[in-house]
């Protein structure tokens, strides 16, 4: 995939991800938290990852693994990528010039709740790793550990790890 197409794919995924109101600091968004974990699970599964949603540590933890079968004779490295899908509350009344849960571009920058912390980074990693898998250029095994409690102190993540 060429760079513009890859960037378009990243942008589309980030738009979908930002639209999910995964606010961990307010219990009324518990259903949105569940939907976000399921959305991540589905994206990872459709791209060849083994995925489990782990409960019992606060909000669900998405744990995904991709075992690279290419060049299986060589000893491969294993990379763990950590991130979080939960966000802080946001509203136009707090100074947002647009809907915080709708990704917008302004002056070459993306605006939207989570675009910087941490949904944007997760999508950069996911988009890149998925493309490397498709091109059969991924030379290592990859795991993603994506939690939904970072904005509330990551309680329980130490027990999970």
Annotate each language-model stretch with its function.
Residues 5, 31, 35, 120, ...:
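Conserved active-site and cofactor/substrate-binding residues in soluble primary-metabolism enzymes
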Residues 156-161:
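Short, intrinsically disordered, charge-balanced linker/junction segments flanking boundaries
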Residues 1-93:
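N-terminal helical capping/dimerization or prosegment-like subdomains
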Residues 71, 150-151:
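Short strand->helix junction
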Residues 76-146, 152:
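Active-site metal-coordination/substrate-binding segment of hydrolases
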Residues 12, 38, 123-127, 155:
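Short, contiguous clusters of charged residues that form electrostatic/catalytic patches at enzyme active sites
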């Amino acid at each position: 995939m060429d760079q513009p197409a890859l960037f378009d794919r990243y942008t589309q995924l980030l738009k979908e991800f930002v639209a999910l109101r995964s606010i961990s600091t307010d219990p009324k968004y518990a259903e949105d938290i569940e939907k976000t974990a399921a959305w991540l699970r589905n994206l990872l599964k459709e791209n060849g990852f083994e995925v489990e949603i782990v409960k019992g540590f606060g909000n669900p933890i998405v744990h995904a693994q991709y075992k690279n079968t290419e060049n299986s004779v060589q000893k491969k490295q294993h990379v763990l990528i950590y991130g979080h899908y939960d966000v802080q509350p946001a509203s136009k009344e707090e100074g947002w010039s647009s809907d915080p849960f709708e990704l917008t571009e302004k002056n070459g920058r993306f605006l939207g709740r989570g675009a910087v912390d941490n949904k944007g980074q997760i999508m950069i990693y996911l988009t890149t790793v998925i493309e490397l898998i498709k091109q059969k250029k991924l030379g290592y095994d990859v795991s993603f550990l994506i939690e939904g409690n970072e904005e509330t102190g990551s309680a329980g993540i130490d027990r999970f790890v």
